[in-house]
Amino acid sequence: MSHHRSTALTPSSAASKIPVEESRTAESDSDEDWVEDDAASLEEHPMPTGWRHRATWLYLLHLLASLAAIIASFILSADALYSARHPDVLLDCDLNAKVSCSTVAQSWQAEIIKLGNLSFPNAYFGIAAESVFITIAVLGLSRVIFPRWFALCAWLGNLAALLYAYWLLSQSLFVINALCPWCILLMFSTTIQFMALSHATVTVQGLPSHPRKLATYYRLGADLLVDVVWIVAIVAVILAVDGSAIFS
């Protein structure tokens, strides 16, 4: 004689399953709503198209700027070593009292990171940072779509490099009272690098999730005007402060 065991849902077990099913349904609905909202956002504010907004152009520009920046960093590192060994010898980029790499290299601003009695030229960290940016550019040229956290960290890292370059420029203009040509090259390279990476972060990597205003900004080409004004403003400030001394 066989015994058949029947399983019946008690009111308590059935009630316990209802919230789980409702939770899963709510999560599914929220995901669908997010996708629908994102699709509606793209339809209302489509992402810009064309070669200027694609990965090939943007990451190529980013790569070229990063290469220029790392070359400048290597030269600055070599100059720092040479100055340490030959403190009384002028560098090749010491053109006059105003355009003087030696004056900038011997300032405390050129070595802001210190560990005890040891100090390291900022150019060493520039080499490390630019190596990372070159890697990002190569991956971007390979059509890699980064995780959102990585794309955000890359942009924030480039922003930090840009802010440091502008801080050093302000110190050179108003505190050190001397300009380093390789530092100027590094500053302009970092600026172009940041412009390209910001553009790629929006149009290629899709960050932020709802870039309505940014999509319109790039689609209308407003970034071109802003970038040109940006570069011209930097040149104007340098010439206004030290123009006469630079060409003396």
Identify the meaning behind each predicted range:
Residues R54-R85, V237:
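N-terminal signal-anchor transmembrane alpha helix
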Residues E27-T56, V204-A222:
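Membrane-interfacial, low-structure loops and terminal tails that flank and connect transmembrane helices
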Residues A236-S248:
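Juxtamembrane boundary at the C-terminal end of a transmembrane helix
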Residues L81-S119:
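Extracytosolic (periplasmic/ER-lumenal) interhelical loops and adjacent juxtamembrane/interface segments
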Residues I145, L169-P181:
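Membrane-interface helix caps and helix-loop-helix hairpins in membrane proteins
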Residues A128-I134, L186-V204, A233-I234:
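Hydrophobic cores of alpha-helical transmembrane segments in multi-pass inner/ER membrane proteins
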Residues V104-V132, L179-T191:
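Membrane-interface loop-to-helix entry segments
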Residues F120-I145, A160, Y164:
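Hydrophobic alpha-helical transmembrane segments
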